[in-house]
């Protein structure tokens, strides 16, 4: 009887030890299985989970616009007063709803090339008004004229055309005209062939972005989705030195197994440069743990604050010898037009940039850019891209509409908020196929290890107690 009891206790202890060992072994084996599965499914080729969602995003993406309506146009034009603006919006469009086109795999270098069609559909139910709402804004053509044509004689000729067309420093335009284009009366009088259509995003609809060529991850998963070339080049030809390089992905996804310590680099054709985001916090998105990466203030800092930005300073006058910060001159990318990009309401911009403008209220939560990245797969499941489009206007002696200005202004035209969040159905699928399985595997590992250890310890204690009792 004593032997049977002792044998049973030893058997229980052995079973517990086996369970504990199996649970311990399952941890690295399970991690290897997860890693192998993830590496297979994030490759950008036909048949993988990543490829299906990469070709056409399953996320509804909206682009909201807020227009800066100028309240005192005559006062500014006559007296060079501060520009008073009133933000109006949002006006919402659905974008990025078209699938990638001309998708071509190249097995020689493990890349896939494509173009991304552009399109925008107005969403009245998500907007405060219609596309026909009017705004008083800077006259884009008049403001750009002295930048593109610096010769004083040519400016004199342009001045006569501006007067003849009854154009001035400011104009009234509908939302649709301002965003997507209108025939400019001044440019229509220019006696040689030029484009007479002007718009902040003209041309956009029925155009494509690319060609992009990205690594598909087939031979090296750590390079998946990273851009190899854009429009056939590895450099942009807009900036000096390393600032001109095309770095990272397009921000829709990143190589898997993202760490908090990483700097996520991505290229944005909207701002004509590569940029980066850093880890801020952990976020629970519809039951999925994600890492929130944010665009740091340092990305738009002056070279004095961040020496790495020295090659983004392209001129010395407006930038106060490269000491101003928070704005980026992308004129070279826009055919010489004086376009400046910033965060909305000049968030993180130097006082000399925002001082001439009244009515701005920068807010970190509303105006910053962030990416919510699922760290195991590297997929961006939620994002908010926020940026502001500004036009530089400065005094021009030969152009009467601008001759009364006493200083240059970087005038905010509009700011946009492009957002996308994984849908409920996609989130459930993601939980079931990825995070749910990983949690279940982790739970099984811990249960086996925990139960095994408890059984082993309990049975061994009982066995020792029995032996001690029998010995007496």
Curated annotation (Swiss-Prot):
Glycans are attached at residues 79, 102, 134, 205, 220, 235, 247, 321, 417. Residues 93-120 are annotated as: Required for interaction with thrombospondins, THBS1 and THBS2. Disulfide bonds join 243-311, 272-333, 313-322. Residues 30-439 are extracellular. GO terms for molecular function: amyloid-beta binding; cargo receptor activity; high-density lipoprotein particle binding; lipid binding; lipoprotein particle binding; lipoteichoic acid immune receptor activity; long-chain fatty acid transmembrane transporter activity; low-density lipoprotein particle binding. InterPro entries: CD36/SCARB1/SNMP1, CD36_fam. A lipid is attached at residues 3, 7, 464, 466 (S-palmitoyl cysteine). There is a cross-link at residues 469, 472 (Glycyl lysine isopeptide (Lys-Gly) (interchain with G-Cter in ubiquitin)). Its main location: membrane. Expressed at high levels in heart, intestine, spleen, adipose tissue, skeletal muscle and, at lower levels, in testes. The record marks 463 as: Critical for TLR4-TLR6 dimerization and signaling. The chain crosses the membrane at residues 8-29, 440-461. GO terms for biological process: amyloid fibril formation; amyloid-beta clearance by cellular catabolic process; apoptotic cell clearance; cell surface receptor signaling pathway; cell-cell adhesion via plasma-membrane adhesion molecules; cellular response to amyloid-beta; cellular response to bacterial lipopeptide; cellular response to diacyl bacterial lipopeptide. GO terms for cellular component: apical part of cell; apical plasma membrane; brush border membrane; caveola; cell periphery; cell surface; external side of plasma membrane; Golgi apparatus. Multifunctional glycoprotein that acts as a receptor for a broad range of ligands. Ligands can be of proteinaceous nature like thrombospondin, fibronectin, collagen or amyloid-beta as well as of lipidic nature such as oxidized low-density lipoprotein (oxLDL), anionic phospholipids, long-chain fatty acids and bacterial diacylated lipopeptides. They are generally multivalent and can therefore engage multiple receptors simultaneously, the resulting formation of CD36 clusters initiates signal transduction and internalization of receptor-ligand complexes. PANTHER family: PLATELET GLYCOPROTEIN 4, SCAVENGER RECEPTOR CLASS B TYPE-1 SR-B1. Interacts with THBS1 and THBS2; the interactions mediate the THBS antiangiogenic activity. Upon interaction with a ligand, such as oxidized low-density lipoprotein (oxLDL) or amyloid-beta 42, rapidly forms a complex with TLR4 and TLR6; the complex is internalized and triggers an inflammatory signal. Through its C-terminus, interacts with PTK2, PXN and LYN, but not with SRC. LYN kinase activity is required for facilitating TLR4:TLR6 heterodimerization and signal initiation. Upon interaction with ligands such as diacylated lipopeptides, interacts with the TLR2:TLR6 heterodimer. This is Platelet glycoprotein 4. It comes from Rattus norvegicus. The gene is Cd36.
